[in-house]
Amino acid sequence: LLLKGYRPEESGLQGEVNAGYLYNYRSGTQGGISLLYTTPKWNIDLLYNTHYEQNRQTTDTYSHHTLKNNIYDICQHNDIDRKGITHYVRTGAEYKFNDNAHINLAYTGVFNPNNDNHSYSDGNITTADNRTKKEARMHNIALDYLSGFGMKAGINYTSYHSESHQQFTNKDNKNQTSEFHTTSGQTIDHWKIYVDQSHTL
């Protein structure tokens, strides 16, 4: 769906809405909206997209291994399930002082609030169950200025955080069980400030 468009010298709102259906072993959806409002002095935009998907991978393994003149038959069935959702957001505003000078402010965010992975393996050698939950988010804010006399200046800040939790259980053919839990994460904060001056000779 596309809203009304406008010529560059006009003021008005234009935009687009989209949606989709993904078919794999399991289904998923995606969709989004984009809007742009313009005046002779201002450009303001908004973009949002989301994507949800789930799928399964299945494998069966049959093999014969020889160890010390003995032949061992190995049969394993493996299932891997994945599902997760991603949100993407961007909004920005530009103000034009004149044809040669403007200032821009933009925000970008990416969010993965819940991504689940589950793998299960069962056979005559071992039975294993592995579950992982992950989440991540990223924020970026950028302010840029261009003067009419060749100076560029700006500030850019990025924040990123992720977490992962894993639970693993394994039982061998002698009924001996091992289990562990892990938690990991990462946090990044990054600043960038710049000033540049150029002259035309």
Model-derived features: where do they sit?
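DNA polymerase sliding clamps and clamp-related checkpoint/processivity subunits
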Residues: 161, 167-174, 183-185
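Short, conserved phosphate-binding/catalytic loop or strand-edge motifs used
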Residues: 122
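Membrane-proximal, glycine/serine-rich, low-complexity loop/turn segments characteristic
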Residues: 1-119, 128-160, 196-201
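Extended amphipathic alpha-helical scaffold segments
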Residues: 118, 165-166
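Beta-propeller domains
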Residues: 138, 168-169, 190-191
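Solvent-exposed loop segments that connect transmembrane elements
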Residues: 66, 71, 169-178
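Juxtamembrane helix-loop boundaries in multi-pass membrane proteins
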Residues: 127-131, 175-183
